[in-house]
């Protein structure tokens, strides 16, 4: 198997890299952790125009089906880390693959039986079903809170940049308006500080929790350069748009003023 990495925010990059051997176009949107947005419909149309048999696979973890529905935009397969928003309570590790029946039957036969062998336990399945019952209510709250928290970050002098699809100034805001019901509960910010200062500041948070996961009821904060992307070289971090000052925030269900107060106390020290 050969994998080609390319920036799909420019559709010309996709066109240049499609070959007669291409079988899958795989991407996530919003992208982690920069929240760059990709046009699902445009990418799917371009790939299928080149070869209808190419499978377009979209990781929809950040949005869930409540905010974004890739299959309706032309994608063939959707994957979720169900550990995140779909479960929503931080107590299950699970994944979901969504697609046409013939494809899913292959996943069950060859993927589970011959390759991974992993299926959810009955109790984990119960917890997932429980979480899905409140998905719409939770996502509405995550998004409403994130919009308020993002607005606060835009006005704080310690913050150089705010990455949030709900801001008019965010590149790709038009794509969000086209394919997302709401802007989501994820925010990334660029702090005017070096790695040591950022770490010291984050360790002072009282309400918010430092953790690499996302989509929980609690607000979770992580420093990509030293946590989720710590294995990246300096060159790889730069190519991915990840600086030492970048902080990713999964805005939770708490009172938004409490979240803002926690961050204000910390950011005022920078």
Predicted regions and their residues:
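Conserved PLP-enzyme active-site core in the AAT-like
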Residues: 1-158, 163, 169, 174
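PLP-dependent enzyme catalytic core of the Aspartate aminotransferase-like
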Residues: 3, 12, 16, 20-23, ...
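Hydrophobic side chains in well-ordered alpha-helices
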Residues: 106-107, 197-201, 259-263
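A common structural junction motif
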Residues: 115-116, 205-213, 266-270
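Short amphipathic alpha-helical segments with coiled-coil-like heptad repeat character
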Residues: 148-154, 209-210, 257-258
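Conserved C-terminal alpha-helix-loop-beta "cap" of PLP-dependent enzymes
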Residues: 161-247, 251
């Amino acid at each position: 198997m050969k994998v080609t990495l390319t920036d799909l925010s420019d559709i010309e990059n996709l066109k240049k890299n499609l070959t007669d051997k291409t079988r899958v176009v795989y991407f996530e949107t919003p992208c982690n952790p920069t929240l760059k947005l990709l046009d699902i419909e445009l990418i799917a149309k371009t790939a299928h125009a080149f070869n209808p048999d190419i499978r377009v696979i979209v990781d929809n973890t950040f949005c869930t089906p409540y905010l974004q529905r890739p299959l309706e935009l032309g994608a063939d397969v959707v994957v979720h880390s169900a550990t995140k928003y779909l479960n929503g309570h931080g107590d299950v590790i699970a994944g979901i693959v969504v697609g046409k029946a013939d494809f899913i039957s292959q996943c069950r036969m060859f993927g589970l039986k011959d390759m991974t062998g992993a299926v959810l336990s009955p109790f984990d399945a119960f917890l997932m079903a429980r979480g899905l019952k409140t998905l719409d209510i939770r996502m509405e709250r995550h998004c409403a809170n994130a919009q308020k928290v993002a607005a606060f970050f835009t006005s704080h002098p310690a913050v150089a940049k705010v990455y949030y699809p709900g801001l008019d100034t965010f590149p790709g805001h038009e794509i969000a308006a086209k394919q997302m019901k709401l802007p989501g509960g994820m925010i990334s910010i660029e702090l005017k500080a070096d790695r040591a200062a950022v770490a010291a500041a984050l360790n002072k948070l009282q309400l918010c929790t430092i953790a690499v996961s996302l989509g929980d009821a609690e607000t979770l904060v992580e420093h990509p350069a030293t946590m989720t992307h710590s294995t990246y070289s300096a060159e790889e971090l730069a190519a991915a748009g990840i600086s030492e000052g970048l902080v990713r925030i999964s805005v939770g269900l708490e009172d938004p003023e409490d979240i803002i107060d926690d961050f204000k106390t910390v950011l005022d020290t920078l």
